[in-house]
Amino acid sequence: MTKVIEALSDWQSIRKTINDLSVGFVPTMGNLHAGHLSLLERSKCENTITVLSLFINPTQFNDKNDFKNYPRTLAQDIAMAEENGIDYVLAPTDDALYPDQYAYKITNSTINNQEAEFRPRHFDGVLTVVMKLLLLVKPTRAYFGEKDYQQLQLVKGLAEAFFLDTEIIGCKIVRNEFGLPLSSRNRRLTEDQYQLAQRFSEIFHSDLSCDEIKNALIQEGIIVDYIEDYNERRFAAVHVGDIRLIDNIPFAKDKKC
């Protein structure tokens, strides 16, 4: 039976009772979809206990409207956790996770490209909340999707830099039948925007160069933040209407931009 925990002190008491068990952790901002469920299933396969967190982290939003419009589906998410046999759901409040009012934060002073360039202070918020959650949950393994690939690499670096006793595991992107990565933001797309998002996916996954992809997307009416190759992966961030979408794929060495 799934146990839902809001008070961090309650979780800390529970955590002491499962010290001898392997614990898998999937941190999310809720609005769960099949991509999240794939992370949870892997955790269940590899650990005795699985913990899911549902917390819309205010410090990682550089756009107040984006934070305001982020889907809030707590009851639905808890029901999905119960249906999928998740042991614990951690659903803290802002004040509980940020008793310091964000006076203390984790930052990476070397990252300045891709998401770091277009979303100022975003990764400060991400790394800070991930550090807090990892210290609270003390998981054996924590699972992150490769859709947010830059975030995944930073979290791995965080765990290594601070000697955290948690294995950070990246999991493959779950896509729809058109190749579009599953994302909570997709649910905010209108029917016309969804068609355009599919075109973004089709063009991005083509054999075109970065510049050719960018030009093709612009011709479709899609606003492009970046299309670039880095460390043998191709990355994209675009706007379809007021919805920002990201994606990344590995690429052959002879197909760099």
UniProtKB/Swiss-Prot annotation:
The UniProt record gives the binding positions of beta-alanine as Q60
Q: Which UniProt keywords apply?
A: ATP-binding, Cytoplasm, Ligase, Nucleotide-binding, Pantothenate biosynthesis
Known catalysed reaction(s)? (R)-pantoate + beta-alanine + ATP = (R)-pantothenate + AMP + diphosphate + H(+)
Name the residues that bind ATP: 29-36, 145-148, 174, 182-185
GO CC terms, sorted: cytosol
Tell me where in or outside the cell this protein is found.
Answer: Cytoplasm
Entry keyword annotation includes Membrane: no
Biological process terms from the Gene Ontology for this record are: pantothenate biosynthetic process
* Major enzyme class: ligase
Which of this chain's residues are annotated to bind (R)-pantoate? Answer: Q60, Q151
Family that this chain belongs to: Belongs to the pantothenate synthetase family.
Q: What is this protein called?
A: Pantothenate synthetase
- The organism is Coxiella burnetii (strain RSA 493 / Nine Mile phase I)
